Amino acid sequence: MNKTVYIFGLVLLLSLGLLGSNSYAAGTSGRSGFMMLNSSDLIGASVRDYAGEFAGIVNEVMIDSGGHAFAIVNHGDYGLYGEEGANTPVPFEALRISQTKSGEEKVVFKMDAERLDFGPYLDPTMPINRQREADIYLHYGIEPYWVGSRTAEKGELKEFNSLNLVSAAVENSCGKVIGIVNEVMVDPDGHAFAVINHGDYDIFGENGVNTPVPFQELRISKTKDGQDIVFLKTDTEHLDFAPYLGYPLKTNSRQYEASIYEFYGIQPYWTQGSGLSK
């Protein structure tokens, strides 16, 4: 099964959990149940419907240009779809994700499996565009996030393979390489960030520091040989002072996520029209 992580645009919170470690902070809940998730940990996780019946497995994670993620669930009647089944994008809002005692991701589809069976599936002949993404949201009774939003990106979607994105070089506006993409992380509502490994290695050690960056602050393109390259829209110094993983605030908290958005002058999505959600 192809365990690729796709990205309609760019990606989400990437992390290190602890500096100098390859294990990340995803999968541990805060007091309110808030949880940061490594997309790589979700791939291969079993998906069950609200009745506890097996519905499929997470095959990929996709992100759109606005940094919103979908779990691609492989499922279906294999006699009908063939041995590879069908791959259906499901908004994170339609999923409940937790961890088992053994540390494995547990994914529950909040609706019955029939809704999944009739959901819009990935079709190589039908590239994802804004209308098709809207159809995905509406199939699950979710209003597309850009409807009524003054800040959400409404342009054409772009698609990236996150396995190519991870380890991609990150350049500043002057074309200087300042770091690499280290991982891909998502919050419970499917909002994503790219975690950039960077910094003065004489200060931070050989592993540098890992900083989550909202997709709005990145531009992604491809080199002539097809490799992804990431451009930071702000200056390098701005990145150096941004909230990093291991920052004094607890990584798995709304307060920490808010500090990331606010550092870049972005209003946290859950505060629009209300106070900070805890």
Residue ranges: model-predicted function:
Residues 9-18:
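Bacterial N-terminal signal peptides
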Residues 4-6, 21-278:
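Peripheral interaction segments used for macromolecular assembly
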